[in-house]
Swiss-Prot record:
GO molecular function term, any single one: translation elongation factor activity
Entry keywords, A to Z: Cytoplasm, Elongation factor, Protein biosynthesis
KW Signal (keyword) present: no
Stated name of the protein: Elongation factor Ts
Length: 282
């Protein structure tokens, strides 16, 4: 005969999210004591998590949030797409975004040792282990990033494919342009620029592109070669530089012209301060 009630079993499952069999085991081992059973399952989760650490994690989700605390983005990976869409896993990821915002964290290893937003009695790493036990798969926090909150900035976040790709755009100069920033983030997910502007293209990337172009037009007069290189570089910049790209919602204008228009209308100097594009596994 069990030494615990069905109500205690139900409470343990609600508190931990662990399966019925393991909850019964925990309560049996702890003589029906709910608090001790929770501790038992946490220890069990840490032990079982270490056995899963070697498993590949190619699926996952990217989540981001911006509020008065700043802006945070995280990528968390699991083994299967099924678990990537699991409610318990998604809740862990959402809580992790809160952890980054609360702790202003920008380093995964440091964040793992800090108290979790979802359960202050656990570190982020301990909660990760408990969640691994619940979903039955390895969970890896691949990367995080935190942007401090500053005045006169607008932040736009766009998520695509249920968190498979997420872009963040930060505009400086105005604090009421979240809608524009989000539209630019949507453009970024679709157009996938590599750099902000022509000036931000690294010298080695530019040299490599010139080398590729030159190899395709050998045997022509130098003046012709220079003209062709100039034209092809213009196309290259339009492909890889955000400000040079045709705006996806209005291809007749570029992102730079779009920003210039907002600056002119508002009387403020508006610029794309920063953007990022994260894709699962990229």
């Amino acid at each position: 005969m069990s030494n615990f009630s069905m109500e205690t079993l139900k409470l343990l499952r609600q508190q931990t999210g662990v399966g019925l069999t393991k909850c019964k085991e925990a309560l049996a081992e702890c003589n029906g004591n709910l608090e001790e059973a929770v501790v038992y399952l946490r220890k069990l989760g840490l032990a079982s998590a270490s056995k899963k650490e070697h498993r590949e994690t190619k699926e996952g989700v990217i989540a981001a949030k911006s509020d008065a605390r700043g802006t945070a983005i995280v990528e968390v990976n699991v083994e299967t797409d099924f678990v990537a869409n699991n409610a318990v896993f998604r809740s862990f990821v959402d809580g992790l975004v809160e952890d980054v915002l609360n702790h202003k964290a920008d380093n995964v290893d440091a964040l793992l040792q800090l108290p979790s937003f979802q359960d202050a009695s656990l570190t982020v790493d301990e909660l990760r282990a408990v969640t691994m036990q619940t979903v039955g798969e390895n969970i890896r926090i691949s990367r995080i990033k935190y942007f401090p909150k500053t005045t006169e900035e607008s932040v736009g976040i766009y998520s695509h494919g249920n968190g498979k790709a997420v872009s963040i755009t930060i505009l400086s100069g105005l604090s009421d342009q979240e809608s524009l920033a989000k539209d630019i983030s949507m453009h970024i997910v679709a157009a996938q620029p590599l750099f902000l502007s022509k000036e931000s293209v690294p010298e080695d990337a530019l040299a490599k592109e010139k080398e590729i172009i030159s190899s395709q037009i050998q045997g022509k007069p130098q003046a012709v070669i220079d003209k062709i290189i100039s034209g092809k570089l213009g196309t290259f910049f339009q492909d890889v530089c955000l400000l040079e790209q045709a705006y996806i919602k209005n291809p007749d204008t570029t992102i730079q012209h779009l920003i210039n228009g907002v600056s002119k209308t508002s009387g403020n100097s508006v610029e794309v301060k920063e953007f990022i594009l994260w894709k699962i596994g990229a």
